[in-house]
Amino acid sequence: MSKHNLIENLKKQIEPIVEGLNYELYHIEFVKEGKENYLRIYIDSENGASLEGCEKVSRAVSELLDDIDPIQESYYLEVSSPGIDRVLYTDKHLEKYKGYNIILNLYSPIDKKKKYEGELIDFNENEINIKVEENIVTIPREKISKTTLKGEL
C-alpha cells in the first residue's frame, strides 16, 4: 500500500475517534527520521489541544492501531497539537486563518524571493493572495512548497 493510501485509510478510521473525543483531526503523517518511523497525528480544537487530550487520543488511536495493524514495520505513535506556527495543509485551514499572517515558502523564486510573509487575504484553487506591507501579492499555488501560520503570541 502506498504511503498516500495508508494515510487516507488511517484518516477514515482515526477521524471518528478523534471527533468522539471533541477534537479535530488536523493532519496525519507517516515519516522516517534516521532509522525510526513515526506516525504523527495532529489534533486541534477551539481551545487547542491539551496534554491530557493528546494522551486520551493517543490511547484510543493506539487501541485501534493494535486491532487493525495497518503498518507492517515498527513505528512510534505521536499525538500532538499542530503548534502555534502550524503548517496550513488544506483549504479549510486557509479559510480559518484568513486575516492572519502566514509564510509562503516557494519551490523557486518569484521576483528573486523564495519566501513571502504577509496577511492572508484570499485564496482559490490556483493562487493565494497575501498583503505584504501595503501591496497585494498573488502567488500561484503550484509554486508554493509550504504554507505556515506565522506564530505570534
From Swiss-Prot:
Q: What is its main location?
A: cytoplasm
Task: Provide the function of this protein.
Answer: Required for maturation of 30S ribosomal subunits.
* Protein location: Cytoplasm
InterPro entries xrefs: Ribosome_maturation_RimP, RimP_C, RimP_C_sf, RimP_N, RimP_N_sf
Keyword set, alphabetical order: Cytoplasm, Ribosome biogenesis
Q: Which HAMAP family match?
A: RimP
Q: Name one GO cellular component term.
A: cytosol
The UniProt entry's sequence similarity note says:
Belongs to the RimP family.
UniProt KW Cell membrane keyword: no
One biological-process term from Gene Ontology? ribosomal small subunit assembly
Among Pfam families, the record links this protein to: DUF150_C, RimP_N
Q: Does the keyword Methyltransferase apply?
A: no
Highest rank taxon of the organism: Bacteria
> What species is given as this protein's source?
Clostridium botulinum (strain Loch Maree / Type A3)
What gene is behind this protein? rimP
This chain belongs to the protein called: Ribosome maturation factor RimP
